[in-house]
Amino acid sequence: MTAISDRFETLKQNQECALIPFITAGDPDLETTAAALKILDSNGADIIELGIPYSDPLADGPVIQAAATRALQNGTKLESVLEMLKVTTPSLQAPIVLFTYYNSILHRGIDNFLEQVAAAGVAGLVVPDLPLEEAAGLLKPATERGIDLILLIAPTSSSERIEAIARSSQGFIYLVSVTGVTGMRSQVEGRVLDLLQKVRQVTDKPLGVGFGISQPAQATQVRDWGADAAIVGSAFVQRLATGTPAEGLSAIAEFCQSLKAAIKTS
């Protein structure tokens, strides 16, 4: 059983929904990123998603795009992120999932990339622009190294595609709550419930909902609809980038606690 599967199994036994915060590596710097990972880990995060800054982030909304731009301007590179993780992950309880684009993987070579991320203690990968037809080439070598390849299902995915993705995805399945990019929205769209029900009919794997969740009430809503995890990105990235690094770290600690409290079953 992988670290992510093990975490979901424990949560299931406790009838708990997972909280998965997202932050961008290197914004404002890697020292703050390491501190943020530890703070999220100790304030309610069950799994943590770490975005690798990329120059052409097609799936990211304005908040995360701006964070990636700042990180790249600071000289953040995948190799330096992995060096930071190698030192940081041994002290974390929450498994780390890297959010990275496919070109970054191909540029380094799949085997070389996976060796590096495995050595850094990474538990899973989300690759938003990975075509399902090419997923097998990454899935097999990742699985051999104990790394879960987490695939995405969008509201526009056909029934056939949903079944294929559900079969292949490891760790959990990432349900995209909206058509479009990441970002904060005032409410979770009702069709998320339809998507959850549709996917649940074909798999018993954990289902995480992301893209657009920014408030505790929204996290509670997706939990009540049957999601196994609430994934929150832009709202964390924005808080971490506000004020000094110390103020940002304090803000994400408080926010993480409020989200976890909101999705804990009474």
UniProtKB/Swiss-Prot annotation:
Enzyme class: lyase
Catalytic reactions on record: (1S,2R)-1-C-(indol-3-yl)glycerol 3-phosphate + L-serine = D-glyceraldehyde 3-phosphate + L-tryptophan + H2O
Active-site residues from the entry: 49 (proton acceptor), 60 (proton acceptor)
Listed GO MF terms: tryptophan synthase activity
InterPro entries assigned: Aldolase_TIM, RibuloseP-bd_barrel, Trp_synthase_alpha_AS, Trp_synthase_suA
PANTHER family linked: TRYPTOPHAN SYNTHASE ALPHA CHAIN, CHLOROPLASTIC, TRYPTOPHAN SYNTHASE, ALPHA CHAIN
EC number(s) on file: 4.2.1.20
Subunit annotation: Tetramer of two alpha and two beta chains.
Protein known as: Tryptophan synthase alpha chain
GO cellular component terms attached to this protein's record: cytosol
Keywords: Amino-acid biosynthesis, Aromatic amino acid biosynthesis, Lyase, Tryptophan biosynthesis
Reported function: The alpha subunit is responsible for the aldol cleavage of indoleglycerol phosphate to indole and glyceraldehyde 3-phosphate.
Keyword Transmembrane: no
Pathway assigned to this chain's UniProt record: Amino-acid biosynthesis; L-tryptophan biosynthesis; L-tryptophan from chorismate: step 5/5
Annotated family: Belongs to the TrpA family.
Cross-referenced CDD domains: Tryptophan_synthase_alpha (cd04724)
